[in-house]
Amino acid sequence: KTVEYTVETENVAEYIINVPEGWHADYADNTLAITAPAKDLCHFDKEGTVAITVVSESGKMAIVKVNVFAGEWVNEVELRILTFEDADCNGEEIGDGIYAWSEFIPTGGQYGNGHGSYWWGDYGNTEIEFTPVYGMYGAYGGHAGISNYVGSDWQNEGNFSFDLQAYNVTGGHSGTNFNTYFGYLDESGYGMMESLPPFYFWDGEARVIDHMWVTNTTYFYNQAHSAGFGSDYVISDESTFKIVAYGYESDDDTEPTVAEFYLLNVGQNFVTEWTKWDLSVLGKVTRVEFNCVGSDDMYGSYGMSVPGYFAYDDVAVQFPGETVFR
């Protein structure tokens, strides 16, 4: 970009203009034009000094300096993060009579105890809201719940009564709490619900979900090794299990964008720690639905023979930040 300055001169015999590398400057007809290097020429100096040495007709010399800086106005992105930590609650109701995330966590055993049947919202922060999906099994058709249960004894603590337990971690990704997800659809007719449990922006505004952190649950880790309900499934080096995210820009959107994350990859490679999942590839969305999909060997006469669970935390959403020149 070129910036022009009006400069009135008199009695100038000659002048020399020195510029930083990559810059250009010219003077003609009382106009000083300074041109910054192109944006893609980042190896040139972004800032420096244009020095103009002027010699008068009487032989006197003066140096005029102009400090220059090349940049652009940039709309920065603010990342707001849903942490599920009580310290980040703002005093507003986030559930039915609930004001802190830990109040959702059952203390009398993980399975049952009302989990899976409640709504929640991260109001005034990410604006993400969740309502349960009621399928053929009622509230247990989709969604598990807020949790702080963790463990690594997958052989003894890997059945359905430990369904809120994240595997092999010491807590949430950045704190104590996290969320657990349950839900899947398949073509067997024995899926747990008629639609997938989504979370969405309650105000209908389309936003970019930048990323979230995911890991396996102890329940899935156990069952992936030993499950066989309705099938002859035995884990092999070819077995896989993934989360598929579907992003919808509006309620009328019938062609969602898609992102995938493998919780179990070939070679019996399980995710056993909090791992970042880039969801920005979905673009701007008003809601996201998640499905759990196994490899063909995980399906039998009653559909998927392993539990469609995963744990997630620290959901980051992009919001407009400050406009800065840089």
Describe each PLM feature range.
Residues I243-R326:
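Terminal, low-complexity interaction segments
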Residues W213-V266:
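Extracellular ligand-binding interfaces
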